[in-house]
UniProtKB/Swiss-Prot annotation:
Family according to the record: Belongs to the universal ribosomal protein uL22 family.
PROSITE patterns associated with the record: RIBOSOMAL_L22 (PS00464)
Keyword vocabulary terms for this entry: Ribonucleoprotein, Ribosomal protein, RNA-binding, rRNA-binding
Name used for this protein in its record: Large ribosomal subunit protein uL22
A Pfam short name: Ribosomal_L22
Annotated source species: Desulforudis audaxviator (strain MP104C)
Any one GO molecular-function label of the UniProt entry: rRNA binding
GO cellular component, one term: cytosolic large ribosomal subunit
Record flagged with keyword Ribonucleoprotein: yes
KW RNA-binding (keyword) present: yes
């Protein structure tokens, strides 16, 4: 059985967030949270929050045992970019794109149905 949690429009670059989610894919929920606690990247906090939410969804909605939960799938999709202008010399301007991410976590206990 599976449970899912999604965090949308997170102000993180998807490329930087994908580096962090690779560390926890396939690990147990408690092990994944322990790894993220000691990961210095800023994305680690956001990923940990989504994993906790997915585990809480599994416990509350599906009556699953938290100790048996595994991070079955975790992926990061790109959200909309916030466009800002940076003034440059001679009256020009460059576009600065602040990228956003959608983080999806699916936890499973290994049982079917």
């Amino acid at each position: 059985m599976e449970a899912k949690a999604v965090a949308r429009y997170i102000r993180l670059s998807p490329a930087k967030a994908r580096e962090v989610v690779g560390l926890v894919r396939g690990k147990s929920v408690d092990e994944a949270l322990a790894i993220l606690r000691f990961t210095p990247q800023r994305a680690a906090g956001a990923v940990a929050k989504v994993i906790k939410s997915a585990a809480a969804n599994a416990e509350h909605n599906n009556d699953m045992d938290r100790t048996r939960l595994v991070v079955a799938k975790v992926y990061v999709d790109q959200g909309p970019s916030l466009k800002r202008f940076r003034p440059r010399a001679y009256g020009r301007a460059n576009v600065i794109k602040h990228r956003t991410s959608h983080i999806t976590v699916i936890v499973s206990d290994g049982k079917e149905g």
